[in-house]
């Protein structure tokens, strides 16, 4: 079981840990929310340092840039590839071919710039309120969304690919365990505000459903790029939803 945790850390982060990878990579999906909680806590702690001297803009930038660093930029790269393929391609095969091209096109660049700007704005609002638990929750729920898509949609490439080992063996049990763990880790912080908890999970599920729908429509399934993209989009949706809650209520 711990081999799944080792695989999850090696897959989702820049950190190197001792131990053997799981024989079945889908078993690492159980641990995705746990790794997300660790990364979210790390980023929130890094944001606290500049915020302690009153520099909320830098605190927000630290979370955005730090998130790219600790994930090796893998998820952001997935978003760029997905944007280039989905909006710069044509038929299914052409779209998949573009997504495999390492070159970032105009749609990918626009997606990354929009992501960074919107994340910075949303996190700025959260740091101004000292909402570190919300920052961490966005990262956690981003990894939950990856599990939900992997467990519910087929792999799009017939020849397989980097993420096929995760998607091929995933099922309802992985989704249920990941969802339960996510609730267990977030509930202690938001049990006094069930509306906010509902809002966070609602934003995450909306992001997952949106990306899943687009991916099924465009390529008939998901790829590693799509799993990376859904993590980034979920973080953005969760942080924007939390920011709106602070603004409106």
From Swiss-Prot:
Pfam assignment, any one: CobS
Transmembrane segments: 29-49, 50-70, 104-124, 131-151, 165-185, 194-214, 226-246
Catalytic activity: alpha-ribazole + adenosylcob(III)inamide-GDP = adenosylcob(III)alamin + GMP + H(+); alpha-ribazole 5'-phosphate + adenosylcob(III)inamide-GDP = adenosylcob(III)alamin 5'-phosphate + GMP + H(+)
Coiled coil region boundaries: none
Cellular localisation: Cell inner membrane
Domain of life: Bacteria
Keyword Cell membrane: yes
Alphabetical GO biological process terms: cobalamin biosynthetic process
GO cellular component: plasma membrane
Membrane topology: Multi-pass membrane protein
GO molecular function: adenosylcobinamide-GDP ribazoletransferase activity; cobalamin 5'-phosphate synthase activity
UniProt pathway annotation: Cofactor biosynthesis; adenosylcobalamin biosynthesis; adenosylcobalamin from cob(II)yrinate a,c-diamide: step 7/7
Record-listed E.C. numbers: 2.7.8.26
Function noted in UniProt: Joins adenosylcobinamide-GDP and alpha-ribazole to generate adenosylcobalamin (Ado-cobalamin). Also synthesizes adenosylcobalamin 5'-phosphate from adenosylcobinamide-GDP and alpha-ribazole 5'-phosphate.
HAMAP family: CobS
Protein name in the entry: Adenosylcobinamide-GDP ribazoletransferase
Originating species: Chlorobium phaeovibrioides (strain DSM 265 / 1930)
